[in-house]
């Protein structure tokens, strides 16, 4: 009883609370009524229910995602086709039979079907006429073969064939090519290293070999002083060295001849240019002398006439 009386007393005493409660209730009714109005407006617009709109948007997103994935995959994929693999199997009749037993001869193995199917392998033999390994020099008088080696191979004993042998000098290999260049004496015979004599066998077909097997001063070249010096020092040259010395001596003899030839040509050219000048000078001097003679003759004639008149 006391509680009710308190409530009644509170209601009677506070009319403002009732008005506040009424206003709050009206606001709740307005808020609850607003979505219903929006829904009705959306229905009236004709776009459809919100569930259908959401479904339509989801489909649109899915389509965009699928297109983006297709573009990415197209850029990342390799467009080159793969190499086709064709598996080829021989029939049983054409399969070669390989015997693992040892064969007595090579002809038995190559005569079978395996040799026919595989065919002959390319020959890997190197021809003897190859220019890289051996260099052959052929002429009417001599034929011998020279191998490319850094230094000549020394022989312990002199090898003879038919009482014929050649003596070659042991010297460092020259750094020049004998095709387009004539070596000098300094290149052939350096002062630092003393050449040593060494016997090397060579195959020579020359009827005049007895002149070369026993070298003399006359066979070493035209330069007698150089030949005497080499002969006294005990240096014996073979055929190649003698030929090189002869070529050097000929080249040295031809070098000083070029200067007088040039001087002679220059003198001839000078005299050829000077002759017409001399002729002009002589002619001019001749005309002057003729004029002087004419004047002197005319003067003498006038003197004679004057004397006669007197």
Curated annotation (Swiss-Prot):
Annotated signal peptide: none
Please give the residue ranges the record annotates as the region Disordered.
1-227, 242-310
Q: Which domain of life is it from?
A: Eukaryota
Q: Which residues carry this modification: Phosphoserine?
A: 285
List where Low complexity composition bias occurs.
110-121
Q: Name one GO cellular component term.
A: cytosol
Entry keyword Phosphoprotein: yes
User: GO molecular function terms here?
Assistant: protein phosphatase inhibitor activity
Where is there biased composition of kind Basic residues?
A: 1-11
Which keywords describe this protein according to UniProt?
Answer: Phosphoprotein
Q: Name one GO biological process term.
A: regulation of signal transduction
Q: Name one Pfam family in it.
A: IPP-2
Where are stretches of biased composition, namely Basic and acidic residues?
51-80, 126-150, 182-195, 254-265
Bias kind Polar residues: ranges: 12-50, 297-310
**Would I find Chloroplast among this entry's keywords?**
no
Specify residue ranges for compositional bias: Acidic residues: 91-105, 242-253
Q: Show the PANTHER family listed in the entry.
A: PROTEIN PHOSPHATASE 1 REGULATORY INHIBITOR SUBUNIT 2, PROTEIN PHOSPHATASE INHIBITOR
Give the protein name, as stated in the record: Uncharacterized protein C17A5.09c
Organism of origin is Schizosaccharomyces pombe (strain 972 / ATCC 24843) (Fission yeast)
Q: List the top taxonomic levels of the source.
A: Eukaryota, Fungi, Dikarya, Ascomycota, Taphrinomycotina
